[in-house]
Amino acid sequence: DLSELNISSSFVEWHGHTADKIIFCDGYHLQHNPWFSWLPLQPVQGDILTLKTDHPLPNEIVQFGKWLLPLANGQLKLGASWQWQPLDEKPNEKAALDLLDACYPYFPHLRQAQRLEHNVGIRPGTRDKQPFLGQHPEQSNLLVFNGFGSKGSLLIPWHAERFLRYFTRAEPLPTSADINRYTHDYFTR
């Protein structure tokens, strides 16, 4: 609960834990963060299916507008859908059927696959498809590392290294990810 944070100009305290800085990595919940809600987040919901088949699967991830990730024991993940509204974190049967329909031309044997799970998540997308990195314009001990959307697993390692250098060595952030690109147009006191 963000209301339980005690923030001063020199420290941040929460439940007896004190730190010099706090980094918000709160996904699509950033839109409710009182310090960073001004950033133009564009969350999007996505469905992913876990299936099981008796047929052989490829040895690598397959991309065909959607993706198929082979797992062990005939299991696989199939994803992902895009849904702008509603953002309710509830499995969408139409999205599941669309995922299946998209894969059947490439993997017709999956028509007989068993559906094990139907998971939903909300991606923290951004207006310009670039992440949000940096410090609050007025409170330098509040930082954000967010907005990686559907490319988090690809983008986070590289950006994490740049972010670490930013607040340990004072190296500049990549301008494409620095939240200063939005301060003039979106931040109000």
Where do the protein language model's features map onto the residues?
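Helix N-terminus capping/helix-initiation residues
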Residues: D1-S3, N92, D178
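Alpha-helix C-terminal capping segments
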Residues: F11-T18, N33-P34, Y106
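A conserved short coil-to-beta-strand element within the FAD-binding core of flavoproteins
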Residues: D1-H15
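Active-site substrate-recognition segment that forms the wall
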Residues: D26-S140
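Generic recognition of long tandem-repeat/solenoid scaffolds
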Residues: V12-G16, L78, L143-F145
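Short hydrophobic core segments
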Residues: H17-H29, A160
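C-terminal catalytic lobe of FAD-dependent flavoproteins
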Residues: A113-R189
